[in-house]
Amino acid sequence: MAKRATRARPGRGRFITFEGGEGSGKSTQIQLLAERLKGQGIETLVTREPGGSPGAEIVRHLLLSGVGKLLGADAETLLFAAARDDHVHQVIEPALKKGVWVLCDRFTDSTAAYQGAAGKVDAAFIEALTHATIGDLEPDLTLILDVPVAVGLHRAIKRRGKAVADRFEQESLSFHESLRDAYRKIAADNPKRCAVVDANADAATVSERIWETMQHRLASALPARARA
């Protein structure tokens, strides 16, 4: 499989991923950022993982229903990789090539955190799968929304209402603590790509923190009026 460039080329869109544990506010913040970018005249696509393409959405249903857990951690990781392969080929890469900015709710760091650090799947196995499916594609910026585990789980319960908790919301408190630690380590190991955003605040405050990070990290790609 051909390697993909990790740095944005002239005319190519920017790839921004949102990461974080349950209830970190990713879904809200990704929409707020998309609206802000569109207001600056930047064509933007919001997508998610697992899912984002017809084939990947089928896999998403299987994964969140708990089927992956029945098959075991390694098999679950394979399902995530299969969904991501379809998503990247069908949605993400075509959009980036057209100059569209892609905002994705979860990407490879979720696999490293959920299946790797918290699920104990071998890191080398995950890395090999990643290179086999999507090559060297990496986000231009990864925003890791950080909240205390108790806060995040409370938000998730409130958001869910009477609906049944999904596969990952049902995990133990120690699992979610491991997730938070894993994301912090990912950020520390990849400081040029990742930015940790304190998301333990109201949505408007977190949105401003994200925009300030965008202005700092992707200033050259933003219109002049957006840098002020």
From Swiss-Prot:
SUPFAM superfamilies: P-loop containing nucleoside triphosphate hydrolases
GO cellular-component term (any): cytosol
GO biological process annotation, one example: dUDP biosynthetic process
This enzyme's EC code(s): 2.7.4.9
Keyword Transmembrane: no
NCBIfam families referenced in this protein's UniProt entry, alphabetically: DTMP_kinase (TIGR00041)
Matching PANTHER family: THYMIDYLATE KINASE, UMP-CMP KINASE 2, MITOCHONDRIAL
Free-text function comment from the UniProt entry: Phosphorylation of dTMP to form dTDP in both de novo and salvage pathways of dTTP synthesis.
Family: Belongs to the thymidylate kinase family.
Protein's UniProt name: Thymidylate kinase
